[in-house]
Amino acid sequence: MKRFDLRPLKADIFERLEELIKKEMQPNEVAIFMFEVGDFSNIPKSVEFIQSKGHELLNSLRFNQADWTIVVRKKA
């Protein structure tokens, strides 16, 4: 399982998220992505983004006051 920190990107996480899934993960591999909560708009957007790409969202939870994590399985 890999862990990727997207917090430095603030709200602009989706391009990097897609790049990491494509290039850094193997099919059926699970990874944890951490990003900054901000105004909470990235939380539902991240769920929709993962599902629209055909990947499986295993978990989505608040990590602390400022950060959120999603656990994703890459599609085969």
Residue ranges of model-derived segments:
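Generic cytosolic/nucleocytoplasmic N-terminal low-complexity/intrinsically disordered segments
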Residues: 1, 44, 52, 73-74
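Amphipathic alpha-helical interaction surfaces in cytosolic regulatory modules
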Residues: 15-21, 39-57
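Long, contiguous binding/interaction regions
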Residues: 26, 30, 49, 60-62
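C-terminal edge-of-domain segments
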Residues: 54-76
